[in-house]
Structure formats: C-alpha cells, structure tokens
Amino acid sequence: MVATSVVQQSSAQRDQRLVLWLDELRLEDVPLVGGKNASLGEMIQQLTPQGVRVPSGFATTSYAYRYFIERTGLDAQLREVLGGFDISDVTELRRRGRKARSLILNATFPDDLKAAILDAYHHMCETAGQNLCFDDESCLADHAYTEVDVAVRSSATAEDLPDASFAGQQETYLNVYGDQAVLIACKKCYASLFTDRAISYRTTKDFDHFEVALSVCIQRMVRSDLATSGVMFSIDTETGFQNAVLITAAYGLGENVVQGSVNPDEYVVFKPTLKSGHAPILSKRLGTKSLRMVYDTTGTELTKNEPVPLSDQARFAIAEDDILQLAHWACTIEDHYTQLRGSYSPMDIEWAKDGLTGELFIVQARPETVQSQKSQTELRSYILEVPDGAEPVAKGRAVGDLIGQGEACVILDISEIGQFRPGEVLVTARTDPDWEPIMKQAGAIVTDQGGRTCHAAIIARELGIPAIVGCDNATQVLTTGEPVTVTCAGGEEGLIYRGELPYRVETTQIDSLPETRTKIMMNVGNPEQAFTLAALPNDGVGLARLEFIIANHIQVHPLALLNFNQLPDGNEKRQIQKLTALYEHKPDYFIDKLAQGVGTLAAAFYPKPVVVRLADFKSNEYAHLLGGSTFEPHEENPMLGWRGASRYYDERYRDGFALECHALKRVRDDMGLTNVILMVPFCRTPDEGRWVLDEMAKHGLVRGENGLQVYVMCELPNNVILADEFSQVFDGFSIGSNDLTQLTLGLDRDSSLVAHLFDERSPGVKRMVKMAIQTAKENNRKIGICGQGPSDYPEFARFLVEQGIDSISLNPDTVVKTRLEIADMEQQMG
C-alpha cells in the first residue's frame, strides 16, 4: 500500500503530481520526469519481462520543480542572476553559478512537496522490510540496517535527447539514507541545474535556462561498493561501428568510471553472433582500477575512495558470464529503443553489480549522442606525417580519430582553469563537469586517468575535440607553453608528440562510389584499425595477416609458452612472465590473444569473407619473438627456408601450430565468425597441402566442416604449374604477387642490388598470373590477388580484370582510388 499523501496525489491530474513511481513511467514522460527517469520507467515496464533488472524507486516531477521555484519566489531572483553576461568569462560564470545555487540551497521545501518525497521514501523503506527510525538520533548509528540507502540522481527535462547529451551535468548522490539526507540531496540536485558547466552548456546549445526543469530520482542502491560497476555503449564509441558493445568495468561504485578517476577494464563483444547464441568477446583489456568508491561508514561523507589491492588490480573485474550478460542487455535495450523511436538508437548505459546478491542491474540508459549523429555517407581520414626519429612523449587511449595541436596547458586543479587560453591543449589528471567551460575551447584534451567511457572522453567526442585519456604521466612529461601534437588517427592508442607535426585530411564520399564486378577487398593486419577500415567500401578481406597480432599483441614465441620452464633465466623470461601473469597455463595466453585479434578482424567485416593467412614468419623473424632464439635455427636464406606450410606439420614446430589452430577454431566455433576462410602460405607441393590439412584436422579445423574453406597462396611457380593438383586440395587461390615475382624472376626482393628488376608487369610474371587464373577457373575455384601490384600499376590491374580474376585485395589507402579505376575499366570493357 502506497503511503497516504502519495495516494492523495494520484487523484490529481498526472502532470500535476509531485511524485511518480518509476514503474508508472514510460519514455513519453520526458517532459514530466526528464530523459533519465523516463528511460528507467520504460525499462522497468517493458524490459523487466525480458530479464533486464532495474532498481525500483520514485521520481519527483518537473511540475514539483517548477512548484518549488514558484512557491519560494526564486524565479525572478534566478533570472536576475543569470541575465546578461558572457559565459566565456570563466570568473564571472563561476560567480553567477555560485549565487544561483546558493539561492536554491537556502530555500525551504513547501510542506506538501516535502511530505510527498518523504512518504514515498518511507514506503520504499517499508517495502524493503526495514524498520524506520525517522531521524531518531538514537538509531542513527544503525542506519545501515534501519533505513534504505538510496541513490539520488537528477534528470533534466531537456536531458538525454539524441542530439544533446547532458551527461554528468547534474549531480548524483550515493548511499543517501534518512529523511533529512534525502531532502538535502533532492535540493542539491535542484541546485545542480545551475552548475557552471550546466549554465555554459545550455547557453552554448541555445536552451533557455527556464524552459528546462529538473526531476529527481530516488532509487534503491545497488551495492556495487562491494562488487563492480561501469559503463557500456551499444556502439563502438570511437569509430561508430554498430555491431560492437563496449563495456568498461572497475571496482566499487560507478562514479569513478564516469568521472575518469580510474582506468577501467575494457571489453568488446560482437552483437550479431552474440544474438545467435555464441560467445564473441572480441577483446579484453586490463585497466589499473587503482581506486574503488565505497560507503563511508566511519567518516562524515556518504562515500569515500580507497586503494584497490594490487592482486585485484591485476585481474579482470568481471567474469566472462557477466560480460556476455551485460552485452545481451545492451542489445535488448538498443533493440527496444530502436523499435520505439523508429530509427537506429545506440545507447549509453550504466550498470552495477550487487555484492550482496551477485545480481547485475542497469541503473541508467540514455541515447548515444555522438556517433549516431555523424554522417554515414562521408569518410574523413586524418594522416599524420611523422618525421624520422620523432618519438611520442606520452601514450594513452585514443578518443575519436582526429588530430589536434597547440601549446600545452598543464592544469592540476580546477582552481587554476582561469589561466587556460582558447586553442591550447588541456593537460590534466582528469576532468569532471566543472571543467567543461574550458574543455570546449581546447585544441585537444589529455588526461592521466580515465578510460573510453569517462567524462573527458564523452565530452571530447561530443565537442569533436581529439582527446587521449589514461596516459598515466602526461602531466609530468608535458610542460605548459610547449607546442604539442595530439593524434588519435592511428587506432586505439593515442600518441602525443612534441612540436606541431604536419598532417593532412582526406575526405571520401562513400555513398557515391560505383559497384564493380571484380570484388575489391582489403589487406589488413592491425585489429585496432579494423572497425575504421570496415567503413571503406569493400567486399571483405582478401588477406588478414597474423604476423602483426603475433608480433605486437602476443610478442612471445609459441614454443616459449609451451616450454616456459625450460627457458634460461633472464630478461626475456621475466618479460614473458609479466605478459602472461593472468594465465595459469601460459599457452592459453597465445590462444586468447590470437583469437581476439582475428575475431576483431573477422567481426569488423562480418558477414563478408575474411581470408586469414596462417602465420608466415620466416625463421629469423620467429627468432625475434620473446624466447624465439631458443627454438629457431639459423638459416642462410630464410626467405626460401623453413617458412609457411613446411613448419606446420614439422615435429619441431607442430605444437606451436596447434596453438594457432585452437585460436582459429575458437574464432569460428565459439565466436560464431564462420566468415573466416583460412589460407596456407608457401605451400610447395600438393602433398604438403594435404599434410597441413591433416594437421589442422587434428585440432578441429576440418575442411568442409561448419562451412570451413581453406585457400592456398599462389606464390610459387609450382603453385601455378600444378594448379590442377592444388585445386583438388584447396577451395581457392590467392596470388601473392610479391613472392611470385621474385621467384619467377629469380631475385631477392630485399636486395637493393637487383631491386630495379623487380616488376609484376614482367611478361613472365604476367604469363604465370594468366595461367593461374585460367586453371582456377577451369577447376571452379575462386582466385584473387593480394599483392601490391594492382595498387601501384593501373595497367596491371586492367590486365587482372581482363583475365577475369575474382577479387583484388588492396592496401586500405588505395581501395577508393583503385575501385574507381576498375569501375572505369569494366565499363570500357563492357
């Protein structure tokens, strides 16, 4: 039974009620309770039956806010305070904001509004089965057991609209308990409508201060102080890739993640195959998570931060089951809002895990406001021209894909923001909403702390400003006044260079590019760039290289992981131990990292084909991996030695190849990315091809099973001469024009002495290519090319098209140019 005054209110017109329960609300109630609270009600009503958990609670209405302003006589006073000043004057902005907030905090709640709030709060306590002490001092010491602890959050009526994020502008108060504390928190929320950043933001976005009202949500606390919490997006925040869920997680209450006080863990999940019952966790990145926010049970504050033990920092904050559950909920929420709005609606969601029950909850969900508003027809690429010898002075997590420049301004405390000048690069430990008046004037933003979902990252995306977060030491290595270049154009890692380096911007209208009969595919290797590259017009990936993933993400020789205890003690062994610290069984490190890298490449282009070439390091290159020198022979000419297929079935390496197979099987079977086609490199004979297929089958990669296709690189003269026989072993060919050219012409392409003779357009090479295409066609086998020749020489590309090649795979920077050229060629050919 709802408390008396709440029942009385329900008899009035709904839009004149002072308090509404969340389960009474729907999304159309934004004018009444703001976007945040309307969204909570929508999820409680519509998504609880689908398993999405949202804590219960109630909301004061926008009518209650306006009633408060009117009854207290604040309207005229606030209009006078906020009228006629320049918001770029930070000192004056702070003075006016402080005055406006003081007016609200010193006002008294009308009796009926106070009663409505407290009656609803008491009802929450009763339904929670707890005994109230109603501010009796004798029981204050036992408040954790006598009163419901609640989260008190503000929700502006203009908040969380798809094209205007008000994220973090109004306040949130956690672990609030007792009548007076709830009332004070509500009043503080009202006052937060006039924080400096909120005044500045509304003015910039041309929102009338007095057209915006505020609703307050009083919601049962989720005890994530005893567990974990974080933020997730149902879209990739940097690239706009729509098929990914990004999840961040840290220990304790969620404010540290939102504010950027910690560097959280990050997880990426692929939506399409998640929905079909697979477990496609594409990446897991460990954050430092050095602090956690918990209840302050002994001090005078509601919450406090405490250090996280190193053992907890060194492990992931949530298990894979929780990652997948959260990703499922993100999909459910996104699908619901997309259907509700009639257009694609990616979501920005806050979640928390209750340490008492072990249950996950959604505590907020609002529209994503940056990527969803970007043009889907134009692709803009920033290319930094780094001089030889230039090294980055700091690194962190890139936000967006832009480049910014200017003089650094290192500010360690909010009280110093008056020294910031427009156009400078803001360098600080972290930001919160109080920094927004100067953030929008920055040429770039750099922080020591924070992850991709922290306050600095969210605001930088919205403002279209390049930012790098989580640098750890930027405030120490950068100096106020020195020119710097901040680049987010290279993938997930952002780099800061001293000086203003040259760069260029390339714009492509991707909606106007012509279709071609010849498939135009891409050569890729770096998973960090995959989501960006997938936005280019393409027909899939003709060559996905494992070498980049192994050299940069794994760094360790597979046999060194299998035989770790046999390695000599020394620096390399210590490095391997550090890299694999999360793994009890060290070979699992190789499998995990390779599966995540390949999975990301395959997911980016799904469901288009992604041809993954098995590792093709030469022995000298394998030796450069950590621990590699112990297991690799010295060869005089490794280019023609123990490489490609000959390694996979060899007793000396087959255990290492088994790890590769396990990773690729995980990508196809566990992640559900069956668009992956495998390709065997440097396969000298058809028999060798069969031996490799047998070896793969031992580890669950059976050609033809679950749609698995296996191609072979056509890069040796023998591959061409015996193409009929190779066609009986493999499903397709990819011409490797680099090796085929050097082996047809009998030269070393790495030797400068004969480099002038290397030419794919040589008549002998072209005859080899023509024979390969013709034989593949006769045997009903797919054939493409993945070398550099078609990119460099339009006449060579024309030759390939004339021969009827199925696909041409290009480096990403030549995809658009070559597509236009091939479309023109095909049109001329008729």
Q: Residue spans of the language-model regions?
A:
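Conserved catalytic alpha/beta cores of large enzymes that bind or transform nucleotide phosphates
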Residues: 244-348, 352-355, 391-403, 413, ...
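N-terminal beta-alpha lobe that positions the nucleotide/phosphoryl donor
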Residues: 1-217, 313-319, 326, 334-339, ...
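Structural motif
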Residues: 51-53, 149-151, 171, 215-216, ...
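Acidic, glycine-rich flexible loop/linker segments
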Residues: 75, 370-372, 394-398, 402-425, ...
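Alpha-helix C-terminal capping segments
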Residues: 43-47, 239, 441, 457-465, ...
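Extended active-site and interfacial segments that coordinate phosphate-rich ligands
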Residues: 166-200, 224-298, 363-395, 441-448, ...
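Conserved alpha/beta-domain cores
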Residues: 145-151, 156-166, 170-173, 211-215, ...
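Conserved metal-phosphate-binding beta-hairpin within the catalytic cores
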Residues: 168, 342-369
